[in-house]
Amino acid sequence: MVAIIYSAEFLRHETGPTHPECPARLTAIATALRKMPGANYLHWQKPSPVTWNLDPYILRCHSQEYLNKLAKLAELGGGSLDADTPVSPQSYDVARLAVRAWLDGVDHVLNQREAVFVLARPPGHHAIRNTGMGFCLLNNVAIAAHYALTRPGVERVAILDWDVHHGNGTEALVDHNPRIFYCSLHQFPCYPGTGAAGDRGQHDNVLNIPLKPGGDGKVYREAFEHKVLPFLRQVKPDLLLVSAGYDANHSDPLAYMNLIPEDYGMMTHYLMEISPYPVLGLEGGYHLPSLAKSVVETLKPLLF
C-alpha cells in the first residue's frame, strides 16, 4: 500500500492562465493514479486541518516577517513575490495546507510503516527563510525534515531532491543541522544557479550532483550507483524524504534533460534499499502527460 495525501484545496492556489505551475498538474496526476495498475493499493487521504500549532514548525524555516508578508499579500487580493512566483487570495492558506500534508506524510510513515506520496502544491524547494521564489511559497520538505527530528526514534533525516533544478532553499534551510542530510541531482548550469559540487554544507551533510544538460537514464543510474547510494548508505537515515520533481523529463519545457517516465521507477527502486517507506512529495514537472506517467512509474516499485 501507498498513501496518497491529496485535497482539492490544493487547486485553489491560482497562478494565471499561462503559468506552468498550474492546478491541472495535480488533476492530471490524480487521474493517472486512479487508472494505474494496482490503483486499489493506493490509499487516498486528505491532509489534517490546519491549526495554530502548525506555526512553530513553519517558523523553524521561515521568518515571522515573511509569513506576515505572504498572508497580507493574499489578504489584499494577491500579487507576486517575484516575476515567477504569483500569490493569489487563497495561496497563503493553500501553502500552509501543503505543509500540513507533508507533516502528515511524516507521521504516516513513522506510525504505519507505509510509503507516502504527497500530492500537493505549491511546491517548496526554492523557498528560503525570508521569501518564496521559483514558484515556491513555503519550503515543505525542509519544514518536514525539521519536524521529523521532533518525533521519537528519528535521529537522522535524509532528503533526496531529484527535481531538475537545485533546491537552493532546502539546502540553505537544513545545511546547518548535522542531523539532516541533503542530496540533490540537478541540471547545471540551470536556475537558480546554485548547487555546485563543492558545496558540502556546514557539517559535510550536503551532496550536490550537478549534471550536464542532456543527461539521460544512464547518467542518472550511474549517479545513483556511484554517488547517491553510497552517500545515503553512510547516512543510514531513520527517515527518507524525496523532493520528487519531474522536470528532468525529455519533454519538459523548463529544462534540457532526457529522462523518460520509467527512469523515475528506476530511482525509486534504488531508494528502496535505503528505505522501503519514503515520504515522496511533488515539486516540479510541467509537461502534463509525462508528469502524470512519471508519478505512476515512481510508485510502481512501492506497490509490486
Curated annotation (Swiss-Prot):
Q: Which Gene3D superfamilies match?
A: Histone deacetylase domain (3.40.800.20)
Keywords (alphabetical) are: Hydrolase
Please give the Gene Ontology molecular function terms for this protein: histone deacetylase activity; hydrolase activity
Q: Show the coiled coil region(s).
A: none
**What is any one GO biological process for this UniProt entry?**
epigenetic regulation of gene expression
User: Per the record's keyword annotation, is Transmembrane helix included, yes or no?
Assistant: no
The family line of this record is: Belongs to the histone deacetylase family.
**Annotated function:** Putative deacetylase.
Q: What is this protein called?
A: Uncharacterized protein slr0245
The organism named in the record is Synechocystis sp. (strain ATCC 27184 / PCC 6803 / Kazusa)
